[in-house]
Design a protein with these regions (language model features):
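Flexible coil/turn and secondary-structure edge motifs
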Residues: 1-167, 215
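Alpha-helical scaffold domains
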Residues: 107, 165-400
Length: 400
């Protein structure tokens, strides 16, 4: 069990909000980083003690990471506001994140920098080692549990998001499988230097994740955004599956959201299970496909893959030109996940127009990676595959 300390304005609301998340074991309100030992609420209220209303959070980092806790905390505050949150004013209501383990500094500062970059200006949130913490009076502990109608500076939408976020995590954990939790990190290449480095898995199958997403298909964009920031792979997938449902009812906002939150679409299954059904579906209905070529030029491989895989919906409508152009752009790509994506889309074209695919292969097979070629001709007869592979092999030998 680990500890972190959050100051987010009135500690009644902050404790209730943070305490709702799965993995948070215990919370305690108190007064932190002031000059007076063991102060009372009345003394802190004068703003002369230097103390800040604070919540001590004890959590299981096997369920929720410090980085995720910090991101969720930032969702509950206005990080630009000085000595004020909601209607509460005074230095006791300043915001901050304080740690007792120096190893936690890196995670706090990483999230802090992310938020500061998003706002584009300095944050008014303290971040440093805890100097002191004194528990508040019993009256202030679990105040909103004991007084459900009591004062809370946080909005109802923020509290609802926290409650539903916790429900999603609980449902995913309940659906997890111990064996899959061991196998999936290897399958998705999460080792150092691999494409999925650092990704974490609960061990939930896609069908079970779909079931959880379906139960939360009316979720807010705020919840989807929070889930996309999770370290858990299945949480991000669940968010994307919810977003697909959103797209069916409100396509324009859903596509805009998707394109501005691609950082969380960072493994091949997350791309393949979302891009065709959000961006791809959007492209079928809209003539401007420039976004595909913007994504294709991205230095982020996942965004490159999104550009290619999104065209699956166009292919299903027998519109092949964008796929062909992108296949030419990525003819000499070195990453096997891009080679496979291009080959996959070419194969889909071949299912509908084999002559067009054969013409493309005859023109470009000399530059085409063998992986791309193998994927593209998977539906060909054994003789056709053998002939193309042999011709490719001869070309490769000649080049050497």
């Amino acid at each position: 069990m680990k500890q972190i300390y959050f100051a987010g304005g009135c500690f009644w609301g902050t404790e209730h909000y943070i305490g709702s998340f799965e993995g948070v074991i215990e919370t305690e309100t108190g007064y932190a980083n002031g000059d007076l030992a063991d102060p009372t609420y009345e003394q802190v209220y004068t703003d002369r003690t230097g103390h800040v209303e604070c919540v001590k959070v004890s959590y299981d980092d096997g369920i929720i990471s410090l980085a995720t806790l910090c991101r969720l905390f930032f969702r509950s505050i206005n990080p630009l506001s000085i000595n004020r949150q909601g209607n509460d004013c005074g230095t006791r209501y300043r915001t901050g994140i304080y740690w007792t383990d120096e190893a936690d500094r890196a995670d706090v500062e990483k999230v802090y920098d992310e938020v500061q970059q998003a706002y584009g200006e300095p944050l008014a949130v303290e971040k440093w080692p805890l100097k002191s913490f004194y528990p508040a009076e019993e009256y202030h502990q679990d105040y909103l549990v004991k007084n459900p109608e009591g004062y809370c500076h946080l909005s109802l939408s923020t509290l609802r998001m926290a409650k539903e976020y916790a429900e999603v995590i609980r449902n995913l954990i309940a659906a997890s499988d111990k064996e899959k939790k061991i196998v999936l990190p290897r399958f998705f290449k999460t080792g150092k230097g691999e494409y999925g480095e650092g990704d974490k898995f609960l061990g939930v199958t896609v069908p079970k994740t779909r079931k959880v997403a379906k139960a939360h298909k009316e979720a807010s964009y705020e919840l989807i955004e929070a889930l996309l920031e999770s370290e858990w792979h299945e949480c991000r997938l669940c968010a994307l599956l919810i977003l697909i449902e959103k797209y069916k009812k409100e396509p324009e906002p859903a596509v805009r959201f998707y394109l501005t939150h691609l950082k969380g679409v960072n493994n091949w299954d997350l791309v393949d299970l979302s891009a065709p059904y959000i961006l791809g579906a959007h492209l079928v209905r809209n003539p401007d496909h420039g976004v595909l070529y913007t994504l294709a030029q991205s230095p982020v491989m996942w965004e490159q893959r999104i550009s290619v895989v999104s065209t699956l919906m166009l292919i299903r409508h027998c519109r092949f030109s964008d796929t062909m152009k992108l296949a030419e752009i990525f003819l000499e790509t070195k990453h096997d996940l891009m080679q496979k994506a291009v080959g996959w889309m070419l194969r889909e074209i071949g299912k509908r127009d084999k002559e067009l695919l054969v013409s493309f292969l005859n023109t470009h097979k000399d530059q085409m990676p063998r992986t791309t070629l193998r994927y593209a001709i998977e539906k060909f007869t054994a003789e056709e595959r053998q002939e193309l592979i042999q011709r490719k092999h001869k070309t490769d030998k000649t080049r050497k």
